[in-house]
């Protein structure tokens, strides 16, 4: 099925068009000696007209019958193309961007393709418990590969060293997998899920 691109989507977000909307589905999590648990997750990738995607994920544990048991965790962040920032971009702080986007056409965006034919991206994700991750990677068609470039932990936060995340669109389902290195262990499988889009991308400003 062709990927529908919202008519009001800023050119810089066209590579992310297949992710936009709200997704929901089930998966499994575990790590080290922790018991493997089934969960249900709702993920939203939202565009507002600015040149970044707002990401939110809500995870609920399931009981043995597959029914919701209790909330597990949330995370949220921002997905964007990795490129040098210009005077017309947002920031620093609350300083707004220029009314006209820095990248105004598909041709401008195409110039950012990397040697692999994809686009370099940066993804920042904030988790409860005092952990913030900065991922670098690429988006190439309906696939995203990410690896942590930096992890910030608040004093008293649980030990977490690094992570990798993989996202892909398979038969119109969003598949993702997360490996992590934590608690002094090597990078290993942590969680994965298969999600179905339940709401399409909302128009910017809605």
UniProtKB/Swiss-Prot annotation:
Cofactor(s) required, per the database record: heme b
Residues binding heme b, per UniProt: 190
Metabolic or biological pathway, per its Swiss-Prot or TrEMBL entry: Nitrogen metabolism
Short sequence motif GXWXGXG: positions: 21-27
EC number in record: 5.99.-.-
Catalytic activity: peroxynitrite = nitrate
Similarity section: Belongs to the nitrobindin family.
Subunit structure as annotated in this protein's UniProt entry: Homodimer.
Protein name as it appears in the record: Peroxynitrite isomerase
Organism: Kocuria rhizophila (strain ATCC 9341 / DSM 348 / NBRC 103217 / DC2201)
Lineage, top ranks: Bacteria, Bacillati, Actinomycetota, Actinomycetes, Micrococcales
């Amino acid at each position: 099925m062709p990927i529908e691109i919202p008519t009001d989507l800023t050119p810089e977000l066209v590579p992310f068009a297949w992710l936009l909307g709200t997704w929901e589905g089930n998966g499994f999590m575990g790590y080290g000696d922790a018991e493997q648990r089934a969960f249900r997750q709702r993920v939203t990738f939202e565009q507002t007209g600015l040149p970044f995607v707002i990401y939110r994920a809500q995870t609920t544990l399931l009981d043995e019958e597959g029914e919701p048991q209790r909330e597990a965790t949330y995370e949220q962040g921002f997905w964007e193309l990795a490129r040098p920032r210009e005077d017309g971009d947002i920031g620093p702080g609350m300083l707004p961007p220029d009314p006209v986007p820095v990248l105004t056409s598909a041709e401008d965006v195409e110039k950012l393709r990397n040697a692999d034919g994809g686009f370099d991206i940066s993804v920042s994700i904030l988790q409860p418990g005092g952990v913030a991750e900065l991922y670098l990677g690429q988006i190439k068609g309906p696939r995203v590969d990410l690896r942590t470039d930096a992890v910030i932990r608040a004093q008293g936060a649980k030990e977490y060293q690094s992570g990798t995340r993989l996202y892909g669109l398979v038969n119109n389902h969003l598949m993702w997998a997360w490996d992590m290195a934590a608690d002094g262990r090597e990078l290993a499988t942590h969680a994965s899920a298969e999600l179905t889009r339940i709401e399409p991308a909302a128009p910017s400003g809605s």
